[in-house]
Amino acid sequence: MKAKETYLSRDFRETVALRFPARAKELNTAFDMRLNALLAENAGASKEKQYHLKRQILPGIAAYETLQRVMPKEEALQTVHGY
């Protein structure tokens, strides 16, 4: 994202750096690619909806989906909920 990084993005990057340092670059790239795809899919949303999508909803989805590459679904969900 070109805008200021969200707390979800920041916390995701911190999680992968601490828990999966050998795969951090790969996971950060996957997160960025998924987030950009989600943003593109929702480009037609109203400005009000865009704000919430960009700040919370879409980064949360991208973090959850990416973390599932390295941990069980429930653990990924709990990790994102902890952000």
Where are these regions (language model features)?
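Generic cytosolic/nucleocytoplasmic N-terminal low-complexity/intrinsically disordered segments
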Residues: 1-3, 48, 53
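Short, charge-rich amphipathic alpha-helices with coiled-coil/heptad character
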Residues: 2-18
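Non-transmembrane, amphipathic alpha-helical segments
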Residues: 16-19, 23, 52
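Short amphipathic alpha-helical heptad-repeat segments
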Residues: 23-36, 56-57
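Charged, low-complexity interaction regions
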Residues: 39-51, 69-70
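Short, charge-rich amphipathic interface segments used for partner binding and complex assembly
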Residues: 51-82
